[in-house]
């Protein structure tokens, strides 16, 4: 049986032998793509996922090769790219609104007629979009990936206590917004989603 190197070993070896980086890509591309697709949509998510690995490869000499798992590092790059994409979209929307005199409706007017699940999806998107960027990043990294608090902290280069406090504030605000929107049952389930992840 072939000895498969850890992420750290593969990245360390890839500094001298670039092809050694391939197992890192093979192991993590799909999960990075899924995270980005949920953040920015599948088309842009695919482009950004490729960019994550292009950046990671170019910056591989900076990776702490004593670390066995590259996921926090890769998700950190992905979060930065998703944040940059969101800023680009916001600037584009503002420019379009200015050009059209501010009379632009970005939500589908028929959304109220959609099934309850779709309506709830919009409520959740709205609630999450109202969070501060720092809290939204922590919530989405934790909710859309299998990263522990410690790994989220590593991905965002912040202390684990900051991850816990931002996640707590984000969950509290989303719960309050769900209750205001008439979904107390979902707010209760969201409250129970607060896990005991001490990692």
What is the role of each PLM region?
Residues 4-7, 92-117, 121, 148, ...:
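Internal acidic/polar
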Residues 12-34:
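A short, charge-rich alpha-helical start-of-domain segment used by transcription regulators
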Residues 15, 38, 51-69, 88-89:
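Sigma70-family region 2
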Residues 27-30, 39, 140-148, 157:
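Short helix-capping/turn signature of helix-turn-helix
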Residues 47-54, 68-80:
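Structural recognition of an alpha-helix C-terminal capping motif at a helix-to-coil junction
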Residues 58-65, 76-98, 117, 169, ...:
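Arg/Lys-rich amphipathic alpha helix in sigma70-family domain 2
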Residues 98, 105-106, 126, 154-155, ...:
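C-terminal edge and immediately downstream basic/flexible tail or linker adjoining helix-turn-helix-like DNA-binding
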Residues 125-137, 145-162, 176:
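Helix-turn-helix DNA-binding module
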